[in-house]
């Protein structure tokens, strides 16, 4: 259900044009200024939508159709040792099955971008990756922000000392696969395999962008912890066991066992099984607690 006030610039009729083709029985609109009791009207619309959705049946879908977003936040000294390499191993596995993974938070790539450039499938993708990086650097400079204004205080407290160290951890999340696509902010996924997506490092903005691109879930590694979630399952993978123990309501999977003598391969097997369960409907913590938010990357004038 799409709800509008009725006097804003983004009118429902204009919004509909950008949606393209959609099922009129499954997408409904309500303009609150045009109805009497918006609560009752909204509940009636939701009851109608539920009646149709309740007839849906689950069907088997191969892993080749799964699309995941790769993100990190509140990184620490273990990020590049445990959780990020785990995501990289999973990403390579998923892509080998014909699936798709998406890496974003471009400013976090500064200092390790040549690793991604060297893995582009062709010259066109190489040039697009160069533009992806340089475009964000120019954005920083245009606002007087130092390109190297990273790592954050939390990163430093967790043991990360330089931007390059943080960037090397960031790029590990996408494994060793070749880059098959580069997308500007707001674009929907078109290619399978590893895609690079333009978005800032801000957790909620980046996660929203990944979900909007068509990712079914966001895999989020963290060493410091965060409870947030966007409108798709936002799975938190801890880099250390202490965080997983202290924040069971935040963390969904503990990668800290990798430094406690569990082989990476065994951890990845358990991780794959868990992701399949979540893709099949099992809730992660942000869903259980109702943490579902979005944030839009804005620049320029706000009226």
Describe the predicted segments one by one.
Residues 1-217, 224-303:
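Metallocofactor- and cofactor-centric catalytic cores in central/energy metabolism, strongly enriched
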